[in-house]
Amino acid sequence: MLKWKWVALALVTSALSANAEESSKEKFLNNYGRMLAVEARCPSWKINQQKVVEILNSFKIANADIEPGGHDWPAIERSIHSNQRAFAGIGPKMMCVKANAMYGPKGAVSPGLMEPK
């Protein structure tokens, strides 16, 4: 009986770990879409591609998956559109301030994912 409890515990732990990883992946995809929306409106900041590649590798996401038509593109596209609406009234100068605050070297959301051009 004890053996089955350990098997059940292992299955639950494995499922929770997979859910946490998927949750982190979804957060990254959402942030990536937001960064694309920010980058389109801010002329002085760009996405730090080196950091993005590191994250893609950690989640085992292929570059093609985050391009239009790719496996993960729908989640990114939803984030882009949502953030474009949210940022509609924000000018380029303020958008660059937000880029730094969210994704710059000391960013509150994900530090280092954007850098000055």
Task: Please give the residue ranges for each predicted region.
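Sec-dependent signal peptide recognition
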Residues: L2-L9
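Immediate post-signal-peptide N-terminus of mature secreted/exported proteins
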Residues: A20-I47
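Acidic, low-complexity intrinsically disordered regions
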Residues: M1-L2, R41, G69
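Compact alpha-helical subdomains of small soluble proteins
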Residues: W45, Q50-K117
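Generic anion/oxyanion-binding catalytic loop in active/binding sites
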Residues: L9, S24, R85
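N-terminal signal peptide c-region/cleavage motif recognized by signal peptidases
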Residues: A15-S17
